[in-house]
Amino acid sequence: MDTKEFPNLTYTRDLQDWGEFVRRTPDEYEAWVNGVTKECTVLEIEILKDLVSRTKKKIFVDTNISVEILHEISDENHVLIMLADPNISVQRFFERPDKEKQFLYQLLLKEDNSEEAMINFRECLKRINSQERYMMFQKSGFNVITRDENRSIDEIFALVENMFGLNR
């Protein structure tokens, strides 16, 4: 992947000091996330075109494609957005066992002032998990499932099947 064409997607690949990643300001972090979304859109649309051309089967993807572009390339009944309360996304970010999240957590703990580093990183997370962004997804016109700790995985699948008309 070319750094000039995809500077945000190649940012972590070319990073010399991972401490720089967790030391970014909320403005820098938000700009990077927005840039990743734009760059992923280009690649993911090409991948989807290729997949669609090779099969007649339904294709399910977890995507970074923006809501605006999804409205251009799909109809409302073919997209599902899964949302968690923004506070959960921020406060419980490191509770998940994902290797990437645990790697970032360890980086933050190794910072000279780990408490300050953690506060800064949570501010970055707050920025990209803002109520404004949440409402943009909520009011996108696409199907939305909001996180409910009392809902089982089977119940979530049943909701998804119903929304996509797969249970007919």
Please report, for each region that a protein language model flagged, where it lies by residue.
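Short, well-ordered beta-to-alpha junction loops that form the rim of enzyme active sites
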Residues: T63-S66, E149
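ATP-dependent small-molecule kinase phosphotransfer cores
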Residues: D2-K58, N64-I65
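Alpha-helix-centered segments that form part of catalytic cores
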Residues: N34-K49, S114-K139
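Structural motif
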Residues: F60-D62, L80-I81
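Short, well-ordered alpha-helical microsegments
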Residues: S66-L70, I153
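NTP-dependent small-molecule kinase module
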Residues: R127-R168
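Short glycine-/polar-rich loops that comprise or flank the Walker A/P-loop
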Residues: I73-H78, S140-F142
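A glycine- and Lys/Arg-enriched "phosphate-lid" helix/loop adjacent to the NTP-binding pocket
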Residues: H78-N129
